[in-house]
């Protein structure tokens, strides 16, 4: 039983996509996205420099571009399996999952992601102090619940930090005030010394996503979701105990999305300022639903890395 994984924001889509620009399907898909978004995605890719120290393009460009790149690669390099049973996206990657499962049209997803990115950028601009996101990874090869529990306890002592992503037993992402994030890094290094070394990485994003700081984005995103139509055809759905579900795992609940447009809209709205429970998403699709073949699509290697931390090996095409 197969599942496909899609990455979120923060991947280096520009240099990663350069080798694929000569592919006609990739070219046509990116051109299609450019017509919808009016963003020169291919120009950003062509002009990117390998190993550049320049920041990634702003959120309003990066989010639609990463969605477009993920779908371009899926179209150009279709999987060996004809149809995936499950679709799992990380944050922004959920929108790629909706397109791949044919629950959302490509053009509708691009418009919705553009609205999402603008709303999130607006929320970030309202913050009085600099905010960011910080990935905290325990480099020990032996996962332990003690690490996550230690981080949870430490975060409670910081007034301006939220949990943004729980990616695995060894990796968690924090969102919040940049000064407090700098402070908690040294605190955690001491607290987890007995468990292993700590590695911290700033995410190349423009704000504290998946946190309380995104609440001002709610109204604008809610309106955009309300204008978006989702395809909930019976052949896409699972039926369990008389209820219908989509084959897409929700970041908010780590369960299948209900086959109901209002439920979909509600969860995608919550996802903007709630933590991404990706560790549990992978656990659900593997342990509860028996997925044993995982494909990682989209630019970058983030999905392969997180899957590996969760004991899952992935196939990548390309």
UniProtKB/Swiss-Prot annotation:
<comment type="pathway">
    <text>Lipid metabolism; fatty acid biosynthesis.</text>
</comment>
<keyword id="KW-0275">Fatty acid biosynthesis</keyword>
<comment type="similarity">
    <text>Belongs to the FabD family.</text>
</comment>
<dbReference type="GO" id="GO:0005739">
    <property type="term" value="C:mitochondrion"/>
</dbReference>
<keyword id="KW-0276">Fatty acid metabolism</keyword>
<dbReference type="GO" id="GO:0006633">
    <property type="term" value="P:fatty acid biosynthetic process"/>
</dbReference>
<dbReference type="InterPro" id="IPR016036">
    <property type="entry name" value="Malonyl_transacylase_ACP-bd"/>
</dbReference>
<dbReference type="InterPro" id="IPR001227">
    <property type="entry name" value="Ac_transferase_dom_sf"/>
</dbReference>
<dbReference type="Pfam" id="PF00698">
    <property type="entry name" value="Acyl_transf_1"/>
</dbReference>
<protein>
    <recommendedName>
        <fullName>Malonyl CoA-acyl carrier protein transacylase, mitochondrial</fullName>
        <ecNumber>2.3.1.39</ecNumber>
    </recommendedName>
</protein>
<keyword id="KW-0809">Transit peptide</keyword>
<keyword id="KW-0012">Acyltransferase</keyword>
<dbReference type="InterPro" id="IPR014043">
    <property type="entry name" value="Acyl_transferase_dom"/>
</dbReference>
<keyword id="KW-0443">Lipid metabolism</keyword>
<keyword id="KW-0444">Lipid biosynthesis</keyword>
<keyword id="KW-0496">Mitochondrion</keyword>
<dbReference type="InterPro" id="IPR016035">
    <property type="entry name" value="Acyl_Trfase/lysoPLipase"/>
</dbReference>
<dbReference type="InterPro" id="IPR050858">
    <property type="entry name" value="Mal-CoA-ACP_Trans/PKS_FabD"/>
</dbReference>
<keyword id="KW-0808">Transferase</keyword>
<comment type="function">
    <text>Involved in biosynthesis of fatty acids in mitochondria.</text>
</comment>
<dbReference type="GO" id="GO:0004314">
    <property type="term" value="F:[acyl-carrier-protein] S-malonyltransferase activity"/>
</dbReference>
